[in-house]
Amino acid sequence: MARSVRRTTLALLLSAVLAMTLFVTAPAHAQDSTWTVSGPSARSGPQARLQLDATTGALTLQVSRGGRTVLEPSPLGIRTEGADLSRGLRLSGRERRVVAERYRTAVGKQRSRDVRMTETRFRFRGDGGARFDLVVRVSDDGVAYRYVLPKGSGDVLGETSAFTLPTDATAWLGAYRRDNENLFNQYPAATAPTGEYMAQALFETRGTYALIAESDLSGRYSAARLIHEAGLPTYRIGLWDERVTSDGALSTPWRALVVGDLATVTESTFTDDLAPASRVADTSWIRPGPALWTWLAGGKPAGQSLSMQKGYVDYAAQRGWPYVVVDAGWYFDPDQWDVTDPDWQTNSWIPELVTYARERGVGIQVWIHHRDLDTAEEREQWLPTLERWGVKGVKIDFMDSESQDTLRWYDEILPATAAHHLLVNFHGSTIPKGIQRTWPHVMTMEGVNGEEKRVNTAQHLTTLPFTRNVIGSMDFTPGAFHRPQRPNAASDAGELGLSVLYESGIQNLAGTPESYDARPLARGFLEQLPAAWDRTRLLAGRPGESAVLARASGGRWFIGGTFAGAAHTAEVPLRLGSGTWLVDLVLDGPDGLVREPRVVRGGDTLSVPVVADGGFAAIACHWRPGRTSCDRTAA
């Protein structure tokens, strides 16, 4: 009897295991032409619907949230030199799993991350027997897919991937440039001008937002841009290279949609969550922080003057800023700008500056042109030398390409700089498509129409937190109070708020010492500024109109707001947590900046007067009797 029970129990267990296996991997039947992939929170998060046309064998992907369409059925597919895998497809199997990860980043809007995504791998065969997998992931804040090609598939000739929006969608787009630096403008998605657009494009339909993004981009592939034809709500994926070379198995980058209400999209870490885990084992040397950036402050003369740089070091030390960034000129021929001195190692004053700065608690980072690091031999000359001198980081400029060859260069420079304990800031570059999870010493990247541009608008400033800065750290370089060309020139409080609003692991402060000393309230605020955050919350905003974000560090919240349009009183709902809080506001007054402390409840709505195209900054801390300031040194 006991033996019979054991046999019966074993048979039941075996049947259960077999049933689970069949559920996971069984080939689809002929009638299976539509499949749904839901995230962990199926009721509130996005849902992906994959459809295989029975007549053409073509694939489409549709995305919805809360029963509303976010993405209309949009074509999928990839073309290789051996096969067109966009038509004539047949499903041969499926596999499902849950992706659950926990990781920490050195910088970003939230350093501790908990990831939970559902993943379905669809296996397809095309005409002639060619094979590929489509991997679809869905989380509470996004949908992503990638193509996985087996070895022998050959080079990639393009994708048929596209994003088709609802006809009533609104778009915020930046025209494509090879350095990803351009203004964001608002259009109806269907009637935006014909052209190419940067891949970080934001769309909104009846209160739900979707941000197109890319993750896990490396030299195995080529970067994407969006190609649009006016009159159609479709944005096609175009690659930098007409042919992407591949001599083995290939996983393409993730094509991602960050989906949700505006707060969900703004606070999302989805592009990092999709990226590979950190490849830097020891991260103890990676330290974010504000930097005094000397280019807008001192221009060409500063880059070639040891005495000027020592002055900047003195000022940074007084402010408690951990870094000074020496920009272009320091290794140029003294008589020829933009020409590398062949004896730069012997002639350089950087070692003296590093010693001077170290004695004052300041680290030195240096600018380098990409052309001086584009070969292995050059990197073997430069990087060990900089490490030996004690330089803390490099700002590498003018890649100006997202080709496969350039991405392969990134694959080489990233482990090399990590090996020599050099923090990295890329300028004239691609944008951080998950790179800061995989390579945590990447503190920030440009890829933005930043402070040095003379054509920015207030609308552009209010769009960046919802587009480019969602993707990863953004070296906008705020704080240039001395520049009359900035769009918020009438609002020093608005300029100050950008230092919080725009996240960057090295927050390069672009003002002159004189401009900070003329604004002691701004100077005091920037002395308190962290560069890495425990969490981020959107308090208020809409792209092109306003943006107010709160970022937490330790027990304090830093708040920054920027607005486009006429002077008004902004109503800002606080999301600081329970209890009573002191909100230490910095506002524009009739004769300059003014400080206005207020005691509020953590869920109150804050009324803030802002000037035209202006803004504000604030620090919030738990209030107790007698507390009048949120400064670190305050009682």
Curated annotation (Swiss-Prot):
One of its GO terms (molecular function) is carbohydrate binding. Binds 1 Ca(2+) ion per subunit. It catalyses: Hydrolysis of terminal, non-reducing alpha-D-galactose residues in alpha-D-galactosides, including galactose oligosaccharides, galactomannans and galactolipids. Keywords: Calcium, Carbohydrate metabolism, Glycosidase, Hydrolase, Metal-binding, Signal. This is Probable retaining alpha-galactosidase. Ca(2+) binds at residues 179, 446, 452. It comes from Streptomyces bingchenggensis (strain BCW-1). Belongs to the glycosyl hydrolase 97 family. It comes from the Bacteria.
